Amino acid sequence: AYDMTQTPSSVSAAVGGTVTINCQASEDISANLAWYQQKPGQPPKLLIYAASDLASGVPSRFKGSGSGTEYTLTISGVQCADAATYYCQSADYSGSAVTFGGGTEVVVKG
């Protein structure tokens, strides 16, 4: 498994603003990186897979980028509904060892 370092731990943004969340892997994970959104009392929702591919039904204001060890989730035109905790996640190629980042709480100020 890999170590995933996610920053920042918390970020606030105004409605309409932009949020950037970073995730650094301890070794090259070859874009084997997903981003999840989790709201209290709900299961995690897949946003991005393979570093930059948007999951079905996810608004295009969510964008994933990066390669090697450095990855970014950008939320443009932030909406109140985007208030949540976001996690990066990687797995080895067997899928047997899954590693999550520590999470980033996004607070949206109306």
UniProtKB/Swiss-Prot annotation:
It holds the Pfam family V-set. Residues 57-88 are annotated as: Framework-3. Residues 24-34 are annotated as: Complementarity-determining-1. InterPro entries: Ig-like_dom (IPR007110), Ig-like_dom_sf (IPR036179), Ig-like_fold (IPR013783), Ig_sub (IPR003599), Ig_sub2 (IPR003598), Ig_V-set (IPR013106), IgV_Light_Chain (IPR050150). SUPFAM superfamilies: Immunoglobulin (SSF48726). Transmembrane segments: none annotated. Residues 1-23 are annotated as: Framework-1. Residues 100-109 are annotated as: Framework-4. Residues 50-56 are annotated as: Complementarity-determining-2. The keyword Heme does not apply. Keywords: Adaptive immunity, Immunity, Immunoglobulin. GO terms for cellular component: immunoglobulin complex. Residues 35-49 are annotated as: Framework-2. This chain was obtained from an immunoglobulin that had no detectable antigen-binding activity and that was produced by immunization of a single rabbit with group a streptococcal vaccine. This is Ig kappa chain V region 3547. It comes from Oryctolagus cuniculus. The lineage of its organism: Eukaryota, Metazoa, Chordata, Craniata, Vertebrata.
